[in-house]
From Swiss-Prot:
PTM annotation (Phosphoserine): residues: 64, 82
UniProt-recorded name of the protein: Matrix protein 2
Source species of the chain: Influenza A virus (strain A/Brevig Mission/1/1918 H1N1)
Xref: InterPro entries: Flu_M2
UniProt function note: Forms a proton-selective ion channel that is necessary for the efficient release of the viral genome during virus entry. After attaching to the cell surface, the virion enters the cell by endocytosis. Acidification of the endosome triggers M2 ion channel activity.
S-palmitoyl cysteine lipid attachment residues: 50
């Protein structure tokens, strides 16, 4: 005897959808939440690099330059740029004082 003959198989009526009364508020709420969850999950997977990079670095804009003379701002920009300039793919050693 095969195993399939020993297992009770559901009748054709039991395969049907049992949620014919879909006007139940709980069913409607669950459906809406499920659809929103699916949409948010898809958007998260598509844009996760942008989203998490924005969350991680978005608030860190650097030190405030309010009230600092323009000459000092320019000097600071040049120092920062020279610290991260890389030529021909070599690493730059930055020594902290």
């Amino acid at each position: 005897m095969s195993l399939l003959t020993e297992v009770e198989t559901p009748t054709r009526n039991e395969w049907g959808c049992r949620c014919n009364d879909s006007s139940d508020p709980l069913v409607i709420a669950a459906s809406i939440i499920g659809i929103l969850h699916l949409i948010l999950w898809i958007l998260d997977r598509l844009f996760f690099k942008c989203i998490y990079r924005r969350l991680k670095y978005g608030l860190k804009r650097g030190p405030s330059t309010e009230g600092v003379p323009e000459s000092m701002r320019e000097e600071y920009r040049k120092e920062q740029q020279s610290a991260v300039d890389v030529d021909d793919g070599h690493f730059v050693n930055i020594e902290l004082e």
